[in-house]
């Protein structure tokens, strides 16, 4: 198999895992693009991205332009004379002149089965919608948002136990394997691109903290999907006793209830059962303000009086 001279562009840990796979391969990473250092932590100290840290540790030249729209940045990239540019969660828009610069163009690893869940939060939205499977798509980039021709797809079933955290880990393992497979096909000229079906496309909007508020007027199944989608961020929550209480883990109960949505039906070490518009949601792990996440048995030991049966939890509209 031919080795390729690669520019890698990415920023978070998810991207760094793909860079590590390239460094372990026969390909040559000749330059790394990543976001400028950002203030982080309580001291707001300028902090390098995980991708930059990995590149520096491996003595690879690092480029951190604030934009790739200006000619000097574009000329610097062209001077690297790369065969291909691999983009994984980079965070900057690539103008057409950049997309056309490498001999084989630019490819992207995206955490969904395109054209479903284009955009910023594909892992979370797949859980939020109750999808049964997700996966990774390697695509040839164009000027649209995740609209390029698909080069390779790998599939992953979504388990009932999955959260965004666990799916992230699974896709962070699957993505690098798919990337190396796609690069092999591109280097050998054996990979056929497939157009995306626009009729099947939808958009994975970024999550917001406001969206994580549990609305008991939804079904138990939808709320269960949201709890999993919003773990580990921003974490589903409800307001009660003047406090914001986060819900880290829940499941749909087999209990049947005609109580008003938001009514606590039972509270035991097995969970706190809450009536919804359709079905009952059992809360299993929660977090009180200023505390770490705890299982419900420990929560009830500390604040059992808050969760007495027939207590009504406030709804979003109330």
From Swiss-Prot:
Enzyme class, broadest EC rank: transferase
GO molecular function: methionyl-tRNA formyltransferase activity
InterPro entries attached to this UniProt entry: Fmt (IPR005794), Formyl_trans_C (IPR005793), Formyl_trans_C_sf (IPR037022), Formyl_transf_N (IPR002376), Formyl_transf_N_sf (IPR036477), Formyl_transferase-like_C_sf (IPR011034), GART_AS (IPR001555), Met-tRNA-FMT_C (IPR044135)
Record HAMAP family: Formyl_trans
Chemical reaction(s) catalysed: L-methionyl-tRNA(fMet) + (6R)-10-formyltetrahydrofolate = N-formyl-L-methionyl-tRNA(fMet) + (6S)-5,6,7,8-tetrahydrofolate + H(+)
Protein's recorded name: Methionyl-tRNA formyltransferase
Similarity comment: Belongs to the Fmt family.
Enzyme Commission (EC) number: 2.1.2.9
Amino-acid positions noted as binding (6S)-5,6,7,8-tetrahydrofolate in the UniProt annotation, renumbered to this chain: 112-115
Gene Ontology CC: one annotated term: cytosol
PROSITE patterns the record matches: GART (PS00373)
Any one Pfam family match given in the protein's UniProt record, by short name: Formyl_trans_N
Organism whose genome encodes this protein: Shewanella sp. (strain W3-18-1)
């Amino acid at each position: 198999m031919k080795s390729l001279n690669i520019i890698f562009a990415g920023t978070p840990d998810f991207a760094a895992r793909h860079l590590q796979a390239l460094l372990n391969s026969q390909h040559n990473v000749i330059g790394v693009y990543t976001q400028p250092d950002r203030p982080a932590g309580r001291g707001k100290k300028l902090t390098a991205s995980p991708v930059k840290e990995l590149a520096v540790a491996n003595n690879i030249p690092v480029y951190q332009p604030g934009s790739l729209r200006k000619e000097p940045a574009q000329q610097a990239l062209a001077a690297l004379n790369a065969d291909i540019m691999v983009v994984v969660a980079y965070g900057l828009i690539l103008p057409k002149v950049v997309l056309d610069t490498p001999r084989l163009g630019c490819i992207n690893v995206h955490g969904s089965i395109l054209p479903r869940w284009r955009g910023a939060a594909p892992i979370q939205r797949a859980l939020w919608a109750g999808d049964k499977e997700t996966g990774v798509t390697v695509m040839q980039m164009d000027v649209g948002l995740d609209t390029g021709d698909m080069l390779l797809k790998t599939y992953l079933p979504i388990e009932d136990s999955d959260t965004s955290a666990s799916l992230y880990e699974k896709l962070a393992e699957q993505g690098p394997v798919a990337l190396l497979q796609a690069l092999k096909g591109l280097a050998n000229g054996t990979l056929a691109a497939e157009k995306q079906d626009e009729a099947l496309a939808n958009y994975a909007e970024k999550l917001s903290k406001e969206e994580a508020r549990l609305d008991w007027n939804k079904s138990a199944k939808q709320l269960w999907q949201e709890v999993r989608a919003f773990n580990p961020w921003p974490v589903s929550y409800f307001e009660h006793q003047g406090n914001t209480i986060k819900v880290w883990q829940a499941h749909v109960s087999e209990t049947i209830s005609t109580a008003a949505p938001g009514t606590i039906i039972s509270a035991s070490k097995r969970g706190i059962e809450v009536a919804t518009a359709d079905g009952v949601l059992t809360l299993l792990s929660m977090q009180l303000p200023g505390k770490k996440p705890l299982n419900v048995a420990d929560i009830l030991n500390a604040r059992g009086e808050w969760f007495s049966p027939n207590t009504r939890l406030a709804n979003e509209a109330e």
